[in-house]
Regions:
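C-terminal regulatory/interaction module of P-loop NTP-utilizing enzymes
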Residues: 1-302
Length: 302
C-alpha cells in the first residue's frame, strides 16, 4: 500500500526539507526515510550514540508539518506507561454513583465503565488515534533499553498501525504515522521487530559532512574554530575511550567555545571545556597532558 499523501515528491525534495530544518542527511538515510513515508513502513535506525538518530525524527516532524510524539524507552517500560491505562479512580467514582442511583446490570455496568471516557491514552495510542487530524511522527527512542516483552507488544502496532484493547476492541490509525525507532545497540533487538521495519545504520559522518552539520547547526561559530573542533573530535574517535563523542558532542563543543568567544582552538580552551565533549572521568584523565597535545597537533594539521 502506498501512502503518498504525506510524502515529498522526491528524495531530493526530502533532503531539501530536512536541510531547511538544519538536518544534513546522507543519501542512504534520505532514501530510507523517503521509502518509509511512501510505503508506510516503520524505520529502524541503529548507530552509535550522538549520530543524529533522535534528531532525525524531530527534523522530519518539522519538515512534514507533523506532530512529534516521543516514547522514551527504559527498562521496565510497560503498557500502562507506553500505550494506555484505565482511569481507575474515575471508574470507581462512577461505579459508586451507579450503585447509589440503583445501579445497572453487570454487563451494562462493564460497558459503562470501560469506554473511552475512562481511557488514559499514552504515546503509542495517541499516535494512532483515528480522530487525530494532523500528521504524526512517532519516535520510539532507544528501544534497546526496553525489555524483550515490550518489543513483542509492539509487533501489532508496527505491522498494522493498530492496537487491540481487550475491553474496547481494536484501535486503528486512519492515517498511518511515520514511525521511527532508534537503538544504540546496548543489546540486540529481536528479528521479529526488525522484519517489520526498514533498516538503516547511521555511521559517524565524514569530516566534510560533519563540518556541514556544524555549519548548519552552529552558524555563528568562527569557521576556523568549527574546523579545528571537528578535526579534534575525529581524532578522539580514533582513541580508545569509554564514551566516544558523537556529533551532538561536536555541536555542543563548538557552541560552548563560541559562547566563550574563542576563535581558534588551543590547549587552554580544550582543558577548560573537556567536560562538554567527554562524559567519563577516566576518559578525561586518559587524554590530558602530553597525549592531548599530540592529539591537538594531529587535528591542526588535518
Amino acid at each position: 500500500v502506498v501512502h503518498s499523501c504525506i510524502s515529498p515528491a522526491s528524495i531530493s525534495e526530502l533532503e531539501q526539507q530536512l536541510a531547511s530544518q538544519r538536518y544534513v542527511a546522507d543519501r542512504g538515510l534520505a532514501v530510507s526515510l523517503f521509502l518509509a513515508l511512501r510505503l508506510a513502513k516503520p524505520l529502524f535506525l541503529e548507530g552509535e550514540a550522538g549520530v543524529g538518530k533522535t534528531s532525525l525524527a524531530s527534523a522530519a516532524a518539522a519538515a512534514l508539518d507533523a506532530d512529534l510524539i516521543r516514547l522514551q524507552c527504559y527498562e521496565g517500560l510497560d503498557v500502562a506507561h507506553a500505550v494506555y491505562e484505565w482511569d481507575y479512580a474515575r471508574q470507581l467514582l462512577e461505579l459508586r454513583i451507579l450503585e447509589a442511583t440503583g445501579g445497572l446490570l453487570k454487563s451494562a455496568a462493564r460497558r459503562e465503565l470501560y469506554n473511552e471516557a475512562f481511557l488514559l491514552k499514552r504515546p503509542l495510542l495517541q499516535a494512532i488515534d483515528p480522530e487525530r487530524t494532523r500528521r504524526v511522527v512517532l519516535l520510539i527512542d532507544e528501544i534497546d533499553r526496553a525489555d524483550e516483552e515490550f518489543e513483542g507488544y509492539l509487533l501489532e502496532l508496527l505491522a498494522e498501525f493498530q492496537i487491540t484493547i481487550p475491553e474496547l476492541g481494536t484501535v486503528r490509525a486512519t492515517k498511518p504515522p511515520l514511525v521511527i525507532l532508534t537503538s544504540n545497540r546496548t543489546r540486540e533487538v529481536h528479528d521479529a521487530l526488525k522484519r517489520r521495519c526498514l533498516y538503516q545504520w547511521i555511521e559517524y559522518p565524514s569530516f566534510e559532512k560533519e563540518m556541514a552539520i556544524v555549519h548548519a547547526r552552529v552558524p555563528h561559530a568562527a569557521q576556523q574554530l568549527a574546523r579545528q573542533v571537528t578535526a579534534l573530535v575525529h581524532e578522539l574517535r580514533g582513541v580508545e575511550l569509554y564514551k566516544v563523542p558523537g556529533v551532538s558532542e561536536t555541536l555542543d563543543w563548538v557552541a560552548a567555545l563560541a559562547a566563550l568567544d574563542r576563535k581558534v582552538l588551543d590547549i587552554a580552551a580544550i582543558e577548560d571545556t573537556l567536560g562538554v565533549v567527554l562524559k567519563a572521568k577516566d576518559d578525561i584523565e586518559a587524554i590530558r597532558g602530553e597525549r592531548l597535545a599530540g592529539i591537538l597537533q594531529r587535528a591542526l594539521t588535518r
